[in-house]
Amino acid sequence: MDHLKHLQQLQNIERIVLSGIVLANHKIEEVHSVLEPSDFYYPPNGLFFEIALKLHEEDCPIDENFIRQKMPKDKQIKEEDLVAIFAASPIDNIEAYVEEIKNASIKRKLFGLANTIREQALESAQKSSDILGAVEREVYALLNGSTIEGFRNIKEVLESAMDLITENQRKGSLEVTGIPTGFVQLDNYTSGFNKGSLVIIGARPSMGKTSLMMNMVLSALNDDRGVAVFSLEMSAEQLALRALSDLTSINMHDLESGRLDDDQWENLAKCFDHLSQKKLFFYDKSYVRIEQIRLQLRKLKSQHKELGIAFIDYLQLMSGSKATKERHEQIAEISRELKTLARELEIPIIALVQLNRSLENRDDKRPILSDIKDSGGIEQDADIVLFLYRGYIYQMRAEDNKIDKLKKEGKIEEAQELYLKVNEERRIHKQNGSIEEAEIIVAKNRNGATGTVYTRFNAPFTRYEDMPIDSHLEEGQETKVDYDIVTT
C-alpha cells in the first residue's frame, strides 16, 4: 500500500513539473538538462514531455492548444491525463521535484539492471569479467546522468579560482599546490602532483623507475592521504621490501636475506608499525585491462574518500578494452581513459612507461618525448612527462662492451686487467655505499616550465634523494661508476 501511495505521489510530482513548464516555457531547458522523457514513471507524462520538447525545438508555445495539435495519432494521451496536467498547481521552484523524478528513475533502472545481472549470471556461456564490465559501464552511465549539474557561469568559476589563489597564499609561496613529489626542485617545476593530472614517468630498463615511484609513494602518504599502487610487474611484497629498505636504511640484500643485527631488527619493527598505519593499497595482478583499473579505483575511492593519488607500474603492461585493436590504438585508449579517470576522481594518476630501445643508438641517451613507446596518445594526454636518466648505467655498459671487444680482438691480458680494475671499483663503491647522480628530466609540463632536476640515487636502499642546487657534475663530465646493483 505504501508503495502504491508513493507511485501516486510521484505521478503528481511529474504533473506539477509539466504544469510548471506550461506556465513558464523557458523552464523546459532547465528540466531537460536533467530529465529525459524516459525518466518519467507514468508513460503519458513522459509523452507529454516529449511533445513539449518538440514544440520548444520548433520555437512554438508550449500550451494546451499546441500540445493537442502535436500529439501523434498512434500515441494519444487520454483526456483525463491531459486535464490532470493542466489542472496541477505549478510552483516556481521545481528543482527539488525534478531531482525527485530523476532519483526515482535511477532506482527503477537499478532494479532493472539487477534483474539483468541475475539473468546474465545464470548464463554459463558468458564470462564473469564480461558481465562485470557491462555492469560497470551501466552503473557509470547512471552516475554520469544522476546530477543536476551542467554548465557553470563565469562568476562561479572565478569565485572558485579566487578561493584557490587565497588558499595558496595562506599556505605560503613555498608550498606546493598539489601532492608533494618528494623532491623540492621537482616541486618547483610542477607545484606537486595536482588533482585531475595524468603524469607519465618514462625510462629505459634498469634506470630505476620503480624505485623512483616508491619514493614518491612514501612521500604522498603524508597528511593521512590514501595512495593506490597498481604493480603489474613486481609483487606487492617486493615493493613493501623496497619501502622498508628506504625507511630503515637497511640495504636490500641484507633485508632480503634476513641477516640483521639487533638494532636493525628494532628499527625494522618501528618502521613496520609506522607503515602499517598508512592508507597504502596495492593491486598486483600481472594482467589487467583498463576497465579493471577503472573499476578498482572507483571502488577504492568510494570506500576511502581520502584516496588522493594512484600509481601504475607500468602502462604498457595493461590491455585496452578490445584486444583486436592495434597496439598503438590500445595505448592511446589507455592513456585517454587514465586522464578521464584522473579528472573524474579528482586525483593525480602517475603512470610509468617503458621507452623505445632506439634511444640506445644515440650518442646522447637522455630521453626525449618521441622515445615513448606507441607514444602518440600518451604524449597528448599527459599533463606532465618526466624522464629518468642515470649516466653511470651507460658508462658501465660502455666498459663492459670495451672488455668484450678486447676479448674478441684477442687482447686477453688487457681485457683481464680492465675487468679486474672495473670490478674492484664497483666493489669498493658498493661497499662504501657511494651515491651517484641521476637526472629527472621534465620534458613536458602543461602548466609550467621544462628542465632538469638533479638527484642522488642510493642503490643499496633503492632510494632517490634531493640534491642541493648547483651541486651536480659539470656538463660533459662523466658520471662516476659506483656499484653493480641495477634496479628495475
Swiss-Prot record:
SF4 helicase domain residues: 172-471
Positions of the UniProt region annotated as ATPase domain: 176-488
Activation and inhibition: A C-terminal fragment of DnaG primase stimulates the helicase and ATPase activities and increases ssDNA binding.
Region listing for N-terminal domain, in residue ranges: 1-145
DNA-binding: is it a keyword of this entry? yes
Q: What biological processes does GO assign it?
A: DNA replication; DNA replication, synthesis of primer
Stretches that traverse the bilayer: none
Gene3D superfamilies for the chain: DNAb Helicase, Chain A, P-loop containing nucleotide triphosphate hydrolases
Q: Cite the NCBIfam families for this sequence.
A: DnaB, PRK08506.1
| Domain observations | Within each hexamer the N-terminal domains (NTD) form a ring, as do the ATPase domains; the 2 rings stack. The HPI (Helicobacter pylori insertion) forms a helix-turn-helix that protrudes from the ATPase domain; one side is positively charged while the other is negatively charged. The HPI inserts form a collar on the exterior of the ATPase domains. In the dodecamer (which has 4 layers) the homohexameric rings stack via their NTD rings.
**Stated role:** The main replicative DNA helicase, it participates in initiation and elongation during chromosome replication. Travels ahead of the DNA replisome, separating dsDNA into templates for DNA synthesis. An ATP-dependent 5'-3' DNA helicase that prefers 5'-tailed substrates (have a 5' single-stranded (ss)DNA tail). ATP, GTP and UTP are equally active for helicase activity in vitro, while dATP and CTP are less active. Its DNA-dependent ATPase activity is stimulated by ssDNA. Binds ss- but not double-stranded (ds)DNA. Rescues a temperature-sensitive E.coli dnaB mutation in vivo.
Q: What is this protein called?
A: Replicative DNA helicase DnaB
- Which species is this UniProt entry from? Helicobacter pylori (strain ATCC 700392 / 26695)
* Lineage, highest ranks first: Bacteria, Pseudomonadati, Campylobacterota, Epsilonproteobacteria, Campylobacterales
Gene, per the UniProt record: dnaB
